[in-house]
């Protein structure tokens, strides 16, 4: 989750390593992800790989149905927005990892608890 520098580079590295990858972005930041369904280039130490992500979406339900492992690659100021988007959608069967952590796991857990949501495994 998150289509900025860290989110996109993490998604492409996971795709290069053979994983199925969904990239989710909040609707208010969707400008940064609207062209990401096209072929993308990952350039790493003089090697260029052409990659396609499996799913690029602004629909939280699609993203959570796609994978039980969620990597939130967003700055600290975005934790609240993503926490609210995940509320009543995420389940205890999911695993949420925050990158970078900055104790965002505590904030995410508090948001989910406040919204009476299920609490997944949360890590940083």
Question: What does each model-identified segment do?
Answer:
Residues 37-58, 123:
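N-terminal glycine-rich dinucleotide-binding loop that anchors FAD/FMN and/or NAD(P) in oxidoreductases
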Residues 35, 65, 110:
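Charged/polar, solvent-exposed surface patches and flexible loops
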Residues 76-124:
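Rossmann-like NAD(P)(H) cofactor-binding subdomain of soluble oxidoreductases
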